[in-house]
Amino acid sequence: MTLFGVRWTAAATALYIIAACADVADEAVDAAATTAGPSARLIQLWSAGTPAFGVFVPNERPRGEVAPDGSRLPPLYTAQGGASLAENPLLDYLFLNLEGSYDAEAVAAIVEGLNQSGSDDAPSLLVRISPIERDGAEAARGRVIEALRLGADGVVIPHVRSPEEARLAVSFFADAGADVWSPDNPNGEILAMIMIEDAGALAAVSEIADTPGYSVLACGIGSLSRDLGSREAGEAGTQEVLAHSERVGLPNMITANAQDVEQRLEEGFLGLLMSGLGADEAIRIGRFAVGR
């Protein structure tokens, strides 16, 4: 898959040229990515058409722990947890899911952990905030600005429901002063991700995909399947979104596991997102499949 270009450092460029001559370009891309900063690491992989592998940041709160009144407690994310993830050489990115309950302290904690890890190739951090419709445009705008200010490498806007809402989502990054990586700005450093997760948005996917100024187009297959009424319909919708992301030259992300990661790679997904105890094994399978 051919994607828009990216600014390479002199060292990364030299390494890529040498590797190409030796017919080992995949290894060169990996090496360039691991010597870059977190956001540049993910951008360089995707600019080269190389799949990237990541995980949901795990909730560290002990299972069954509740508040004194018996109510459910929010997820817990710590700097120590972020530092531990940063030491995992398999990870290209982390996906911090704050869709259910936005928490600026969680963003700050994971960023602190990544910064304190001492790792030269710490993964990129993508933060998923709540949908625009849930708390309103101004709340969403403020969260994008805040997450980026705290050090996130990108922000994910879920449940984008129309072309108008897609343009609104992109405007949040402009208001943050973010240098967004996109087909019109291949030298950008921040990732802006839009997710299509309902039937209405799927019907408008072509116009949503054509929205300028964002980095990644993805489909929330679970949410879309529920909205459409079946897993089969959700899968068909996911493939339609993938086709449009490829048409406009953007990477597409999907959840995967050890059983389907090779299939998803063959289909053309460039962002593979794992979870749970089997995440590392699934990533090993995926990396082997693409020669990483």
Regions found by a protein language model. Give the residues of each.
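Bacterial N-terminal signal peptides that target proteins for export
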Residues: M1-A10
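Residue-level signal for mature regions of secreted extracellular proteins and peptides
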Residues: A14-L15
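Expand to "…catalyze enediolate/carbanion chemistry for C-C bond making/breaking, isomerization
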Residues: A28-R292
